[in-house]
Swiss-Prot record:
<dbReference type="Pfam" id="PF02224">
    <property type="entry name" value="Cytidylate_kin"/>
</dbReference>
<keyword id="KW-0418">Kinase</keyword>
<keyword id="KW-0808">Transferase</keyword>
<dbReference type="InterPro" id="IPR027417">
    <property type="entry name" value="P-loop_NTPase"/>
</dbReference>
<dbReference type="GO" id="GO:0005829">
    <property type="term" value="C:cytosol"/>
</dbReference>
<dbReference type="InterPro" id="IPR011994">
    <property type="entry name" value="Cytidylate_kinase_dom"/>
</dbReference>
<keyword id="KW-0547">Nucleotide-binding</keyword>
<dbReference type="GO" id="GO:0036431">
    <property type="term" value="F:dCMP kinase activity"/>
</dbReference>
<dbReference type="GO" id="GO:0015949">
    <property type="term" value="P:nucleobase-containing small molecule interconversion"/>
</dbReference>
<feature type="binding site">
    <location>
        <begin position="10"/>
        <end position="18"/>
    </location>
    <ligand>
        <name>ATP</name>
    </ligand>
</feature>
<comment type="similarity">
    <text>Belongs to the cytidylate kinase family. Type 1 subfamily.</text>
</comment>
<keyword id="KW-0963">Cytoplasm</keyword>
<dbReference type="InterPro" id="IPR003136">
    <property type="entry name" value="Cytidylate_kin"/>
</dbReference>
<dbReference type="GO" id="GO:0005524">
    <property type="term" value="F:ATP binding"/>
</dbReference>
<dbReference type="GO" id="GO:0006220">
    <property type="term" value="P:pyrimidine nucleotide metabolic process"/>
</dbReference>
<dbReference type="GO" id="GO:0036430">
    <property type="term" value="F:CMP kinase activity"/>
</dbReference>
<keyword id="KW-0067">ATP-binding</keyword>
Amino acid sequence: MKAINIALDGPAAAGKSTIAKRVASELSMIYVDTGAMYRALTYKYLKLNKTEDFAKLVDQTTLDLTYKADKGQCVILDNEDVTDFLRNNDVTQHVSYVASKEPVRSFAVKKQKELAAEKGIVMDGRDIGTVVLPDADLKVYMIASVEERAERRYKDNQLRGIESNFEDLKRDIEARDQYDMNREISPLRKADDAVTLDTTGKSIEEVTDEILAMVSQIK
C-alpha cells in the first residue's frame, strides 16, 4: 500500500485517540496525538497561573513528541516529560479555552503539519481534516452519543484513579461540544469529504475494522 495520511476528527470522548492508536498499529503507521499537544500547552498555561499572554507562552515553549516502547507517545514540554500530567481534571477543564487561542493554534498546527509531511501518519483531533491535513487520503468524522462519551470518560477516569461524577461529565461534554463548534478559530466541524462514523454501542475492534475497510478501498 502507498504511504498515506489518515485524519480522524470528532468531539470529545468520541474514541478518536483509542481508535487512531489501533489503526496506526494495524497499518504500521505513526500515531500523532494532537490533543496531547494542546494539553501540554494547557498544562504550561496553568503552571503560569493562567497567563493571558499566549504569544509569549508559545514563544518560550519547546514541544516535541517522542516514542518509548513501554509508554508509546510521550510529550516533552520544555525538556520535561509531562505525559503523565496531561489527563487530570484541571487540564481537561481548560484545554478547549487554551486551544481556541490563535497563537496556541498556530504553534500546534505548524508542528502537526511538519510531523505529517513524510506521510504514514494517523492523526486525530478537532480540525485535522479541515485545517491540518486538508489533503489527507482518508478523513473520518467520529461521533457518539453524549451518554456514551460520558461513560467512556468516567471509565477512563476510574482507571486513572480520578474521581468524577457521571452527570457532571455529561454536562462538561455538552458544554465542550458547544465551545468547540462555535469557537472563532478552527471550530469543530466535519470536512466536506469526510466519512461520518457513529461509534455509539460499537466495540473498539468493530470501529477499527470499519476504518481498516475504508483504508483498503484507497487506490
